[in-house]
């Protein structure tokens, strides 16, 4: 990338407000301030969306929808302050979509309209200069040049590889969240043949000790992190590239199992 104009991108996922890990969020702000990104990308599940869940609430989930709005607004203002001059993007994750988009097994449409973040003055003001992708699915993504951003749907390694090939570009990078598993930059392979596709995952930003519904899950590989990218041509739209025109790394704040 020598001699070419590059842009810096900072990307995180799964804050699950209001149960965001405070130590992680403070660390995140410091990382953003130090990196001075041109773009901020939030891969989704910004809201926990407790009131849109289909199952019984745990006694520890004792907050209301306004608490989630206040938490997101507070976080958005802090990110805005830490990333002055940056363009900011939020893609809906499954929790956000369940909360704010019509679904037959979730909230009634009139309740969604009343509780939508755009109807909350505090949240809508804090997010006024964010570009928001208000949909979610395996084929929903945001692309900045050779970098493809998505919340992600599949949790399996094979499914993540499939989504990478389907929706990113040759010699491009796919950045996704959803799994809560931070992963280093990896190049896809097929029967030991390397493919020109790459992926990376920042992990999550939630305090999983406050997630009773994941208590029985194997969280050994769960962690909190941030993906930092430097890329050429992020303001251009191309469907394929002849070579890798970016660099990326994941920085880890903490892991569920600190032996890893």
Please identify what each model-predicted range represents.
Residues 147-242:
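Conserved beta-sheet core of the metallophosphoesterase superfamily
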Residues 111-146:
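Metallo-beta-lactamase
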Residues 1-10, 141-148:
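Beta-strand-turn-beta hairpins that frame and shape the catalytic cleft
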């Amino acid at each position: 990338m020598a001699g070419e104009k590059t842009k810096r991108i900072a990307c995180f996922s799964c804050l699950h407000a209001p149960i965001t890990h405070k130590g992680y969020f403070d660390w995140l702000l410091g990382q953003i301030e130090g990196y001075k990104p041109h773009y901020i990308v939030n891969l989704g599940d910004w809201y926990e969306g407790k009131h849109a869940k289909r199952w019984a609430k745990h006694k520890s989930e004792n907050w209301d929808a306004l608490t989630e709005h206040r938490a997101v607004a507070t976080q958005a203002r802090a990110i805005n302050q830490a990333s002055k001059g940056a363009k900011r993007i939020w893609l809906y994750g499954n929790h956000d979509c369940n909360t704010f988009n019509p679904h037959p097994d979730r909230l009634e449409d009139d309740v969604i309209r009343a509780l939508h973040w755009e109807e909350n003055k505090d949240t809508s003001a804090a997010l006024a200069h964010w570009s928001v992708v208000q949909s979610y699915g395996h084929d929903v993504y945001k692309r900045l040049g050779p970098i493809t951003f998505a919340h992600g749907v599949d949790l399996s390694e094979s499914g993540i590889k499939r989504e990478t090939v389907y929706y990113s570009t040759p010699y491009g990078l796919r950045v996704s969240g959803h799994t809560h598993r931070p992963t280093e930059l990896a190049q896809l392979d097929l029967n030991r043949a390397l493919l020109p596709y790459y992926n990376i995952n920042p992990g999550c930003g939630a305090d999983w000790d406050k997630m009773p519904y994941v208590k029985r899950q194997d969280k050994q590989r769960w962690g909190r992190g941030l993906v930092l990218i430097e890329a050429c041509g992020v303001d251009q739209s191309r469907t394929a590239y002849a070579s890798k025109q970016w660099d990326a790394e994941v920085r880890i704040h903490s892991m569920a199992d600190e032996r890893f």
